[in-house]
Amino acid sequence: MKRIILTLCLATVACLTAFAQKALFEKYSDTDGVTTVYISRNMMRMMGNVRAGDKDISKIASRLDYLKILSCERPSLIPSIKKTAQSIFNQQKYSIVMQVNEGGEHTTIYGRNYPNGKKEFALLAIERNEITIINLLGNISLQDIQGIAGGK
């Protein structure tokens, strides 16, 4: 009985987390100057070369459950998107796994582990006139994400 209750609790937490991330992307999906993209596992399997913006993710595409991208080149929206994203990352107990500040670009990679062994990473890249959030869930490692962030 304890196992059933624990399993239900974990499933509920996973659903709430997915809902919070979904809310971020949906909040800005119909906003002028904001581009949102959702790519499912099935779609990634059908595509040969998978790119997230200028990043090649073909090497890990088969291990992903989904890929979400939010990109905004409208400077007036950047503070709001940043604040919303960071609030969600804090509320959902993401940990900062890597930060890079280089030439005016600030990149933070947040991560979380799930009980089923899957990992979720959110890459938040902020430049002077642009913000990009890339959210990935699957059987992936930090090294995979660093390869994407570094453009390898």
Predicted features and spans:
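Bacterial Sec-dependent N-terminal signal peptides
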Residues: M1-E26
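Early exported N-terminus immediately downstream of N-terminal targeting peptides
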Residues: F25-S76, S80
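Extended interaction-bearing regions that mediate binding to partners or small molecules
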Residues: G33-T35, A61-Y66, I96-T107, Y114, ...
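Solvent-exposed interaction surfaces and binding hotspots enriched for charged
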Residues: V34, R41, S80-K83, E102, ...
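Mid-chain, structured segments of secreted extracytoplasmic proteins
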Residues: L64-T108
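A short, solvent-exposed beta-edge/loop patch
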Residues: R112-N139
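A short, surface-exposed interaction/processing loop segment used at functional sites
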Residues: T132-K152
